[in-house]
């Protein structure tokens, strides 16, 4: 039961944080590139790598890794925005978004793990 509470608590704060950051960017940027989702997912990849690399206890992994990072990052929004770019025939931005998210995401996860100690 405690494990579920840790995941739920982290998830609550992760979702609220993502919501706030997304809204902040929407009010300040006018671009076809989905910058908020990109930065959230890249930051999440780095932080999750750092959490895992740091070797924190299972409780912290559940709270921060599974809970917070699971709700903070957003695979579904990433895919939805990719489809929207495709439907709008904005293929150059789509290619940039897909390649940057995957390449930089993997690099940042690796960097986080290295800085965390793995």
UniProtKB/Swiss-Prot annotation:
Its main location: membrane. GO terms for molecular function: fluoride channel activity; metal ion binding. It catalyses: fluoride(in) = fluoride(out). GO terms for cellular component: plasma membrane. Na(+) is not transported, but it plays an essential structural role and its presence is essential for fluoride channel function. The keyword Cell wall biogenesis/degradation does not apply. Na(+) binds at residues 70, 73. One of its GO terms (biological process) is cellular detoxification of fluoride. Keywords: Cell membrane, Ion channel, Ion transport, Membrane, Metal-binding, Sodium, Transmembrane, Transmembrane helix, Transport. It is found in: Cell membrane. Fluoride-specific ion channel. Important for reducing fluoride concentration in the cell, thus reducing its toxicity. This is Fluoride-specific ion channel FluC 2.
């Amino acid at each position: 039961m405690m494990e579920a509470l840790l995941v739920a608590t982290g998830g609550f704060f992760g979702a609220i944080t993502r919501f706030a950051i997304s809204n902040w960017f929407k009010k300040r940027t006018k671009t076809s590139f989905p910058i908020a989702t990109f930065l959230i997912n890249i930051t999440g990849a780095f932080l999750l790598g750092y959490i895992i690399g740091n070797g924190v206890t299972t409780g912290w992994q559940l709270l921060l890794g599974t809970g917070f990072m699971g709700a903070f990052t957003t695979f579904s929004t990433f895919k939805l925005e990719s489809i929207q770019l495709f439907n709008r025939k904005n293929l150059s931005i789509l290619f940039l978004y897909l390649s940057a998210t995957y390449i930089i995401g993997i690099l940042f996860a690796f960097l986080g793990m290295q800085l965390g100690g793995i």
